[in-house]
Swiss-Prot record:
Residues 12-35 have a biased composition (Polar residues). One of its GO terms (cellular component) is nucleus. Disulfide bonds: none annotated. Keywords: Chromosomal rearrangement, Coiled coil. PANTHER family: MIRROR-IMAGE POLYDACTYLY GENE 1 PROTEIN (PTHR22089:SF2). It comes from the Eukaryota. This is Mirror-image polydactyly gene 1 protein. It comes from Homo sapiens (Human). One of its GO terms (molecular function) is identical protein binding.
Length: 442
C-alpha cells in the first residue's frame, strides 16, 4: 500500500513538472487545463487519504478540503485542514510501532498539498490578470465604438454639406444660364425686329423713288434733251431744263437720304456689335469666375475648360465680325466721299453720259447695300445658331452636374455601407468577447 501511494505521488510530481513546462501556452487555455487537472488531482488525493485511513486505524486521519474562488466573488478562501486524531486506548503500543516509511509518506503528502496551494495562488493571480485584460479590452472596444460613431457622424455631416453645396451651385448656375439664354433670345428677337423694320423702311424708300412724278419718269434724259433741241420757244426750253434739273436734284436728295439712312443703320449695327462684344466679354469674365469657383469645389471636372475654349472661339469670331463691320463702315465712307466728288463734278447738264454712269453707279451701290444687308442677315442667323449651340452646351453641363450629384449620392451610400459593415464587425467582436467565459478552479 505504501509503495502504491509513493508511485501515485511520484507520477503526480511528474505531471506537475510537465504542467509547469507547458505554461508558455495562452493564459486562458492554461487556466482551463490547470483547473481540470487540479480538480482531478485533489479528488485522487482525497480518495487516497481515505483509503489509507481505512487500512490503518491507528494512524492519524487527515481530511483536506480545497475551496475555489466563486465566479461572482474574487475573494479567496484558504484551504483548511481538519486533523482528527483517533487514539485507541486499548492499542497504544501499536501507534508507537509505526514504521518510518509511513512518516515519510505523510511528509510527501504535506509537500504536495503545499505545492498545490502555491499553484492555486498562481492560478488566482493569472485569473486576476485575465480579468484586468478583459476590462482593458472592454474599454478599448467602447473607445473604438465611440470613435466610429463620431467618424460616421462627421462623414454624414460632410456628405450633407457637400450635397447641399452641390445642389445650391447647380440651382444657381441653372438660374444664371436660364437668365443668360433668355436675355440672348430677347436680343435676337429685338435684332430680328430691327432688321425687319429696316427692310420695310428700305422698301418704302424705294417705292417713294419709283413714285416721283410717274409721268416724268416715263421720259428719259435723252427724250428731254431731244425736246430741248426741238423746242422752238425759250419757254419750252426752260420748262424742259427745269424738269431735268428738278429730276437731278430729287435723285440727289434721294441718294443722300438713302446713304444717310444706310450710314445710320450701319452705325447702329456697329454700336450693337460693340455692345454685344462688351456683353460677351462680361459674360466670358463671369463664366471664368464661375469656372474658377467650380474648379475649387470640384477639381475632377474638365467641362469648364471646353466651355472657356468655346467662349474664346466665340469671342474671336465676334471680334472678326466687328472688324468686318468696321471695314464695311470705312468702305461706305469712302463710297460716300466718291459720291460727293461725283456730285460736285456732275453739276453741269452737258455731261449726260456721266450722269448715266453715275445713275448706274448709284444703282450698283444700292445692289451692294442690299447684298451687305443680306450678309448682315446671314450673320444674325449664324449668331442665332451659336446661341442655340450655347444652349445645348448649357443643357449638357446641367446633365453633367446631375451625374456628378448622382455619383456623390452613390459615394455616400458606399460610405454608409462601409459604416454598417464596421458596426457589424464590432457587434461580432462584442459577441465573441461576451461569450468567452472564465472557468474557476473547483
Amino acid at each position: 500500500m505504501e509503495n502504491w501511494s509513493k508511485d501515485i505521488t511520484h507520477s503526480y510530481l511528474e505531471q506537475e513538472t510537465t504542467g509547469i513546462n507547458k505554461s508558455t501556452q495562452p493564459d486562458e487555455q492554461l487556466t482551463m487545463n490547470s483547473e481540470k487537472s487540479m480538480h482531478r488531482k485533489s479528488t485522487e488525493l482525497v480518495n487516497e487519504i481515505t483509503c489509507e485511513n481505512t487500512e490503518w486505524p491507528g494512524q492519524r486521519s487527515t481530511n483536506f478540503q480545497i475551496i475555489s474562488s466563486y465566479p461572482d466573488d474574487e475573494s479567496v478562501y484558504c484551504t483548511t485542514e481538519k486533523y482528527n486524531v483517533m487514539e485507541h486506548r486499548h492499542n497504544d503500543m501499536h501507534y508507537e510501532c509505526m514504521t518510518p516509511c509511513q512518516v515519510t509518506s505523510d511528509s510527501d503528502k504535506e509537500k504536495t498539498i503545499a505545492f498545490l496551494l502555491k499553484e492555486l495562488d498562481i492560478l488566482r493571480t493569472s485569473n486576476k490578470k485575465l480579468q484586468q485584460k478583459l476590462a482593458k479590452e472592454d474599454k478599448e472596444q467602447r473607445k473604438l465604438k465611440f470613435k466610429l460613431e463620431l467618424q460616421e457622424k462627421e462623414t454624414e455631416a460632410k456628405i450633407a454639406e457637400k450635397t447641399a453645396a452641390l445642389v445650391e451651385e447647380v440651382y444657381f448656375a441653372q438660374k444664371e444660364r436660364d437668365e443668360a439664354v433668355m436675355s440672348r433670345l430677347q436680343l435676337a428677337i429685338e435684332e430680328r425686329d430691327e432688321a425687319i423694320a429696316r427692310a420695310k423702311h428700305m422698301e418704302m424708300s424705294l417705292k417713294v423713288l419709283e413714285n416721283i412724278n410717274p409721268e416724268e419718269n416715263d421720259m428719259t434724259l435723252q427724250e428731254l434733251l431731244n425736246r430741248i433741241n426741238n423746242a422752238d420757244t425759250g419757254i419750252a426750253i426752260q420748262k424742259n431744263g427745269a424738269i431735268i434739273v428738278d429730276r437731278i436734284y430729287k435723285t440727289k436728295e434721294c441718294k443722300m437720304r438713302i446713304t444717310a439712312e444706310e450710314m445710320s443703320a450701319l452705325i447702329e449695327e456697329r454700336d450693337a456689335a460693340l455692345s454685344k462684344c462688351k456683353r460677351l466679354e462680361q459674360e466670358l469674365h463671369h463664366v471664368k469666375e464661375q469656372n474658377q469657383t467650380s474648379a475649387n469645389n470640384m477639381r475632377h471636372l474638365t467641362a469648364e475648360n471646353n466651355q472657356e475654349r468655346a467662349l474664346k472661339a466665340k469671342l474671336l469670331s465676334m471680334q472678326q465680325a466687328r472688324e468686318t463691320a468696321v471695314q464695311q463702315y470705312k468702305k461706305l465712307e469712302e463710297e460716300i466721299q466718291t459720291l460727293r466728288v461725283y456730285y460736285s463734278l456732275h453739276k453741269s447738264l452737258s455731261q449726260e453720259e456721266n450722269l448715266k454712269d453715275q445713275f448706274n453707279y448709284t444703282l450698283s451701290t444700292y445692289e451692294e447695300a442690299l447684298k451687305n444687308r443680306e450678309n448682315i442677315v446671314s450673320i444674325t442667323q449664324q449668331q442665332n445658331e451659336e446661341l442655340a449651340t450655347q444652349l445645348q452646351q448649357a443643357l449638357t453641363e446641367r446633365a453633367n452636374m446631375e451625374l456628378q450629384l448622382q455619383h456623390a449620392r452613390e459615394a455616400s451610400q458606399v460610405a454608409n455601407e462601409k459604416v454598417q459593415k464596421l458596426e457589424r464587425l464590432v457587434d461580432v467582436l462584442r459577441k465573441k468577447v461576451g461569450t468567452g467565459t472564465m472557468r474557476t478552479v473547483i
